[in-house]
Regions:
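Residues at the starts of beta-strands that form the adenosine-phosphate
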Residues: 9, 31-32, 138, 180-181, ...
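Nucleotide phosphate-binding/pyrophosphate-handling subdomain across enzymes
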Residues: 2-9, 19-29, 277-384, 398
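Phosphate-binding loop of NTP-binding sites
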Residues: 27-28, 66-69, 78-222, 226-239, ...
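C-terminal helical cap/extension that packs against the catalytic core
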Residues: 49-50, 57, 373-423
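Beta-strand->loop->alpha-helix junctions that form or flank phosphate-binding loops
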Residues: 37, 63, 98-102, 235-259, ...
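Residues in the short beta-alpha loop(s) of Rossmann-like NAD(P)-binding domains
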Residues: 16, 39-41, 145, 223-224, ...
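N-terminal leader/targeting and accessory segments in enzymes
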Residues: 1-99, 398
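Short internal beta-strands
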Residues: 31-40, 218-222, 362-363, 382-391
Length: 423
């Protein structure tokens, strides 16, 4: 695939991190590349004209010209919707359109662990990388978290493992992408404005499995309603494993993880293994969803021979990632958490589920994003006060003030200061 790929020319749509990364990588390999972005220069944080000029990489900004159609392959930024005019035009010209992770995978000889899901993928990706690293393995964590996939390719060693966070946007434009191990953590309604409908969104996620073979592993969350219903009714590729809070999965899969008597158990029928790995009360990051993230990480790392001791020690120490139910500090008996990455109702749901009561919640969102029903249960039973901010503060007030005291604030700073006084 590498040799064939280097005989092609590439137009990269989008000058963000992954676009610049793949352009520079392909250029170093001798390919003909061109970057195009419709944004103005001041908005392009990763565009360094001096570097591009030095490396003889052509580019245009402020709009897409027809020059991009002179190239064999288009590598599309995840932010560009499939129904955008430029993509429609490319399709009409029968251009091959791929994502950065697809093209980067053509040049990756290391085994790839690919992780996707509506929620939890960053935490699980970083956690998986940390467990493997503590086992002494050479690990490159990249994708939707930190470095772009293409930025780690030159650093790969013979024994490296790539742990890749993948979004539905990236998976949508894959064709040959083939991870050694893949995990789908959950799939709930999100990004419908990009995909058009939930069916398209779900199918984009399942592209992670489409090229896997008997030597590969596919893992999914058996507790997630959509995963359980949809994956049970289709033929999946690779060695299929699952994780669940229900011990019954031992009878349904050859390998997996489950919770019983507050312990995560790992089982592999072929290897005659069924044993506890860790007590869930010893996991540093709290919440049912983080137990599920931990089970996914256990299954992914067991494939590479990681010991129970290393897994347990890592889970006891792992502090999570920034902005995802991140413990900030405790002041005068009040514990402060930052969950600003909770950008949909399902992620807010799992955050509220992690705390039993007496929650003071700073809440806000985009205008028109007013489907509060998903979190009503926990708001009414566990939250004692809401500080509403952003475009939806009035809608939050109207929806919840009858049940919970709601204070409308003009800024996040005001909400933090007022909530601090109330705590």
């Amino acid at each position: 695939m590498k040799k064939e790929a280097l005989n092609k020319s590439y137009a990269i749509l989008g000058a963000a991190r992954s676009g610049i990364g793949i352009a520079r990588f392909l250029k170093r390999k001798g390919a003909d590349v061109f970057i195009s972005d419709e944004s103005s220069e001041e908005k392009l944080l990763y565009l360094d004209k001096d570097i591009l000029d030095k490396e003889n990489i052509g580019y245009e900004i402020g709009g897409h010209s027809d020059k991009i159609f002179d190239y064999d392959i288009i590598i599309k930024s995840p932010g560009i919707k499939p129904d955008s005019e430029i993509i429609k035009k490319a399709v009409s010209k029968n251009k091959e359109i791929y994502s950065e992770i697809e093209v980067a995978s053509w040049f990756c000889d290391a085994p790839i662990i690919a992780i996707t899901g509506t929620n939890g993928k960053t935490t699980t990706t970083v956690l998986t990388g940390e467990i493997l690293s503590r086992q002494g393995l050479d690990v490159k964590v990249c994708g939707n978290v930190g470095l772009a996939f293409s930025e780690v390719l030159d650093d790969l060693k013979e024994n490296s493992i790539v742990v890749l966070e993948t979004s539905s946007f990236q998976l949508f434009n894959t064709k040959y992408f083939k991870p050694k191990a893949a995990a789908v953590l959950n799939v709930t309604v999100d990004h419908i404005d990009w995909h058009g409908n939930f069916e398209n969104y779900f199918e984009a996620k399942t592209n992670i499995n489409i090229n896997q073979t008997d030597e590969d592993y596919f893992i999914y969350n058996y507790d997630d309603p959509e995963c359980k219903a949809r994956f049970a009714g289709r033929t999946l590729n690779g060695n299929v494993c699952a994780f669940s809070y229900e011990p019954e999965i031992q009878t349904l899969f050859k390998a997996g993880a489950y919770v019983e008597k507050n312990k995560i158990n790992y089982f592999d029928i072929i290897k005659y293994i069924n044993a506890p790995v860790i007590d869930i009360r010893d996991i540093f990051i709290k919440g049912k969803h983080n137990v599920q993230n931990a089970m996914a990480a256990i299954l992914l790392t067991k494939i590479f021979g990681v010991t129970d001791e290393v897994i347990a020690d890592t889970l006891k120490d792992f502090k999570g990632v920034e902005h995802r139910i991140e413990f900030v500090r405790e002041i005068d008996g009040v514990r402060y958490y930052n969950d600003s990455k909770a950008t949909n109702y399902d992620s807010t749901y799992v955050a509220l589920e992690s705390f039993p009561s007496d929650i003071i919640l700073i809440m806000g969102g985009k205008k028109g994003d007013n489907n509060f029903a998903r979190v009503d249960e926990f708001i009414k039973s566990r939250v004692k006060k809401i500080f509403a901010i952003g475009q939806t503060r009035d809608a939050i007030y109207e929806h919840y003030n009858e049940f919970v005291k709601v204070v409308k604030c003009d800024s996040l700073e005001e909400a933090v200061n007022k909530s601090n006084k109330d705590s």
